Regions:
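Conserved, structured core domains in eukaryotic proteins
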Residues: 59, 65-66, 85-88, 141, ...
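Solenoid-like repeat scaffolds
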Residues: 42-48, 78-87, 117-125, 154-160, ...
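"A position-specific structural signal for the A-helix of alpha-solenoid helical repeats
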Residues: 58, 94-98, 133-134, 168, ...
Length: 376
């Protein structure tokens, strides 16, 4: 729907609620006399104005999404003409106004003034936290990094369960890491914030954050700073949204982040085995081939080393091996996860294996088809 059609729809709805207001407003004095001025019933008489404020905020939101900042601001100013609005609508109005200024570099100071001049006393904790998150975003864009970090920390202190605050704090640290690629603690902080936000979102917004986590893990150093940040996370894990990244997690089994990937794949195997079984089945064959090649190369290198060594040199091949921390190949991790899946869901694993075997048999080309393929 284009913005012109939405404008016509808004005008029609405002006309409808204007008629509702004309019918209800004469009843306000009667309600105040019967039940007192502080009665909750009194607010029902202004329900038409509340709906009008909601309409204005929604239209301003759509206008901002269309890149029409002037239309958004002019629409929001109409809220001040209403005699009565709810706290939630006042919050949405101020948030839309600040976001509209945020996307215009020459209006950043104006948007920051909107936030600083807002009286937060009447707002809930989550709304106050979102205001401080917006303040941190403006300060960060204005180049005041320390003040932005303090604003994000204040937002988290006000509401630990607001995913938007965690997301923006993670983006703040992520941006600093892009400017200073050697500062791994910034990337670790970003990963911690992203994982916390993904666990709180409970919707598809978590996927965009998890993509960023996987990208940051590829920038890990030799000490494993980033995967340790993942390992130290003890909050809720959105297993359903990690399903999308099963191929990436399986590939991580062959890197330093194998411990983190193994833990996630085990949780997926216990909760959603059908989404994982065929990936494991295919990866098992690939990783087994890699394991055989690696072991063969190690044996050839060991034989060459023993051949070049003096005859009287002591053989201490086992001295370099640490029995407490044996090296594990990706194939070992896949085998372990597959065994857990088969143990937890034996009938399901058997059924899916039968399906795979039937597919191989049914789609296997006949001898005539092989001859035709080879000769043409």
């Amino acid at each position: 729907m284009c913005i012109r059609d939405r404008s016509d729809l808004v005008a029609w709805r405002q006309h409808v609620f204007s008629s509702v207001n004309k019918a209800y407003l004469p009843l306000v004095p009667l309600i105040q006399r019967n039940e007192g001025p502080g009665s909750s019933t009194n607010s029902y008489a202004y329900r038409g104005y509340h709906e009008t404020a909601w309409i204005i905020n929604r239209f301003a939101h759509v206008a901002r999404k269309h890149g029409l900042g002037d239309v958004c601001i002019s629409s929001l100013t109409k809220i001040y003409t209403l005699p009565n609005i709810e706290i939630q609508e006042a919050f949405l109005k101020l948030r839309e106004q600040a976001r509209c200024h945020y996307h215009k570099p020459h209006e950043l100071s104006q948007g920051l003034n909107v936030i600083n001049n807002t009286n937060l006393m009447f707002f809930a904790a989550a709304q106050k936290a979102e205001f401080f998150s917006l303040k941190g975003m403006f300060l960060n864009k204005l180049g005041m990094s320390e003040e932005a970090n303090q604003a994000f920390a204040t937002a988290i202190q006000m509401d630990l369960n607001l995913p938007k605050s965690w997301t923006e704090w993670g983006r703040y640290n992520d941006g600093l890491f892009r400017e200073k690629p050697t500062s791994m603690h910034l990337a670790a902080n970003a990963i911690s914030c992203y994982l916390q936000a993904a666990g709180l979102y409970k919707n598809a917004k978590a996927r965009k954050i998890l993509v960023r986590v996987l990208w940051l893990l590829n920038c890990d150093d030799a000490q494993g700073t980033l995967w340790q940040a993942c390992d130290n996370y003890s909050g809720e894990t959105p297993i359903w949204y990690w399903i999308t990244f099963i191929p990436q997690l399986i590939q991580l089994l062959s890197h330093r982040q194998s411990k983190f990937a193994r833990k996630l794949l085990m949780q997926i195997a216990k909760s959603f085995p059908q989404s994982l079984y065929y990936y494991l089945r295919t990866s098992k064959e690939d990783f087994a081939l890699m394991k055989r090649s690696s072991l063969a190369a190690s044996q050839r290198a060991a034989r060459a080393q023993n051949k070049d060594a003096p005859a009287d040199a002591p053989k201490n091949d086992e001295a370099d091996k640490d029995p407490a921390n044996p090296h594990r190949f990706p194939a070992d991790h896949v085998e372990e996860i597959l065994n857990i899946l088969k143990t937890a869901f034996p009938l399901l694993a058997l059924t899916m294996e039968n399906i795979a075997e039937q597919l191989q048999q049914r789609f296997k080309p006949s001898n005539d088809e092989d001859i035709y393929r080879l000769t043409n």
